[in-house]
């Protein structure tokens, strides 16, 4: 409001006259002389009184009333016109903005109503950053025992393992964690928390693409006393629990080194007499290999005796591969 008043005053100045002192043309006569002359009084007290009255009369005559100039009608009309233009422009701008937003909202609603529904496609689901649940379940769980395993701690929560804690073992790298901790970790990661080994590549390949090996014929023969060939390899397998899953042979390198020592000393594995049965494995390329040198000929002989169990295992022999996959013997 003060800014508007200042603007109006600066645009339309108002002429205001202030009171001014008007000079007197008539000469100033000494009051005492005039008074004494006119009244013929020589008393000092009377002269002083007459001087005061003369001064007051002179001051009254010197001042005139103040006259101010009132604003003209033209100034009032111009001020009112300016205010009307300002308020009209402001309200017009505000009204046009509201009207434009209303029209845009109506147009968008009309366009969305006429749009075909088949054009609306759902967004792609986010990619799963965690490990597959099948791979997680493939890692074994076991209750922890301080007496058997000693003192150890979980690398995720940094707390020591206590008795009867459920532990999950990552068989790929042999690292153990609390089941709850490692399951939460696998929801957003695919690696081991300790060694950062990628667990998704190898495990997914083994789950989705099982090992394909050709089947071989197992020939069961009755007990016989004829000597075995020098290059025959005999593997002892128990048959005490036929329905039990065949176990795993670890330390493949030790088996191969032991085999080489046996061949160097011209020793052989003799058949087991616990059950009196033996299995001779014959391959399709046996006839071709018989024509080769004797050192390259290998015959695999599997005898069922009744002592050990094997799980999934892969043992490499010279020029041959023996696969023991859950009870199915295969040679590649």
Swiss-Prot record:
SMART domains for the chain: RING (SM00184)
Pfam families (alphabetical): zf-RING_2
GO BP terms: protein ubiquitination
Cellular localization per UniProt: Membrane
Presence of keyword Magnesium: no
Any GO MF annotation of the entry: zinc ion binding
Catalyzed reactions per annotation: S-ubiquitinyl-[E2 ubiquitin-conjugating enzyme]-L-cysteine + [acceptor protein]-L-lysine = [E2 ubiquitin-conjugating enzyme]-L-cysteine + N(6)-ubiquitinyl-[acceptor protein]-L-lysine
Protein name: RING-H2 finger protein ATL81
Originating species: Arabidopsis thaliana (Mouse-ear cress)
The gene coding this protein: ATL81
């Amino acid at each position: 409001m003060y800014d508007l008043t200042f603007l109006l005053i600066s645009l339309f100045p108002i002429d205001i006259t202030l009171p001014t002192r008007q000079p007197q043309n008539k000469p100033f006569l000494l009051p005492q002389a005039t008074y004494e002359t006119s009244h013929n009084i020589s008393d000092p007290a009377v002269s002083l009184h007459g001087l005061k009255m003369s001064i007051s009369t002179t001051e009254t005559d010197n001042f005139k009333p103040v006259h101010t100039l009132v604003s003209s009608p033209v100034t009032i009309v111009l001020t009112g016109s300016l205010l009307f233009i300002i308020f009209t422009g402001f309200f017009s701008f505000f009204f046009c903005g509201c009207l434009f937003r209303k029209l845009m909202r109506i147009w968008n609603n009309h366009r969305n109503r006429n749009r075909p529904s088949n054009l609306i496609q759902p967004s792609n689901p986010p990619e799963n950053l965690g490990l597959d649940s099948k791979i997680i379940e493939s890692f074994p769980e076991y209750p922890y025992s301080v007496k058997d395993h000693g003192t150890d701690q979980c690398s995720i929560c940094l707390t020591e393992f206590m008795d009867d804690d459920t532990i999950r073992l990552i068989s790929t790298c042999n690292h153990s964690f609390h089941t709850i901790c490692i399951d939460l970790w696998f929801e957003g990661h695919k690696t081991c928390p300790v060694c950062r080994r990628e667990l998704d590549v190898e495990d997914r390949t083994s789950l989705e693409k099982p090992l394909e090996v050709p089947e071989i014929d197992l020939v069961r023969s009755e007990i016989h006393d004829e000597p075995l060939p020098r290059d025959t390899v005999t593997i002892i397998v128990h048959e005490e629990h036929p329905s039990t899953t065949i176990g795993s042979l670890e330390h493949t390198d030790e088996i191969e080194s032991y085999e080489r020592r046996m061949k160097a000393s011209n020793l052989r594995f003799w058949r087991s007499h616990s059950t009196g049965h033996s299995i001779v494995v014959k391959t399709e390329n046996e006839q071709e290999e018989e024509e080769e040198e004797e050192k390259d000929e290998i015959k695999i002989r599997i005898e069922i005796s009744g002592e050990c169990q094997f799980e999934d295992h892969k043992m490499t022999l010279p020029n041959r591969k023996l696969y023991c996959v859950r009870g199915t013997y295969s040679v590649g």
